[in-house]
Regions:
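Karyopherin-beta/Importin-beta family HEAT-repeat alpha-solenoid scaffold
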Residues: 1-229
């Protein structure tokens, strides 16, 4: 990794050739899965480059979803050590969640689905990484940000523009939130209006999906929040 690091950094910084940048982002994910916690010494540089790209208005928009997903790969690899990057990462996820599009434009609808899937993959990696090191409580300040995107997805279901991949990813985050923070009051939040309504609507749609994997995730997530104690 020390010998490869400079080339990886050059690839991540090469926003002008977005395909090169996208490949470098994919390599980061592979490195995280291979090295796991041993990737930690390189995370300051990697996270810094990823954040810089997200803030760059010249970056090709198609690179943003894999960047967001990459934060989940990093968090899953380093576990509780991701806590130092939480504030800035969560801020970026919330900012990306506010992206609005013309739903009559098929290309933009596809992009929004990819963006949301990347955001949910980031949330999943962070939640699972923290839980592995018994640091789930570090996510508590950011629960409402995640729930707001889940609400947006649930409210968009009737329009028919939400992909099954996004539905499954959203349901997965609901399940991860319930598994990680249920004892700290998320179940109580989920039973309150308006959270109860959109969470149940989303999970009902997931459980009714023709995709077996989405259906299973929906059933599991529903159980983490609404199963009797």
């Amino acid at each position: 990794m020390p010998h490869f690091r400079p080339f990886l950094g050059l690839g991540l910084a090469n926003y002008e050739e977005h395909q090169v940048c996208a490949v470098a982002i994919g390599v980061v994910g592979d490195i995280c899965r291979a090295l796991e916690g041993n990737v930690l010494p390189y995370c300051d540089e990697i996270v810094g480059l990823l954040l810089r790209n997200l803030q760059n208005p010249a970056l090709n928009r198609n690179v943003k979803p894999p960047i967001l997903s990459c934060f989940g790969d990093i968090a899953l690899a380093v576990g509780g050590n991701f806590e130092k990057y939480m504030q800035v990462t969560m801020s970026m996820l919330v900012q990306a969640s506010s992206t609005a599009i013309d739903t009559g434009n098929a290309d933009l609808v596809e992009y929004l689905n990819q963006l949301r899937e990347g955001i949910f993959e980031a949330y999943t990696g962070v939640l699972q990484g923290l839980r592995a090191d018994d640091k789930s409580g570090a996510f508590e300040p950011y629960v409402m940000g995640a729930l707001d995107l889940i609400r947006q997805v649930a409210e968009g279901i009737p329009s028919g523009t939400t992909s099954d991949e996004v539905l499954r990813a959203a349901a997965g985050v609901v399940g991860d939130l319930g598994s990680s923070l249920g004892a700290r009051g998320l179940k109580a939040v989920a039973r309150q209006s308006p959270h109860r309504e959109y969470l149940k609507a989303l999970l009902k749609e997931a459980k009714a999906s023709s995709n077996e994997q989405t259906k299973q995730v929906g059933v599991w997530a529903h159980g983490t929040l609404f199963a009797p104690p």
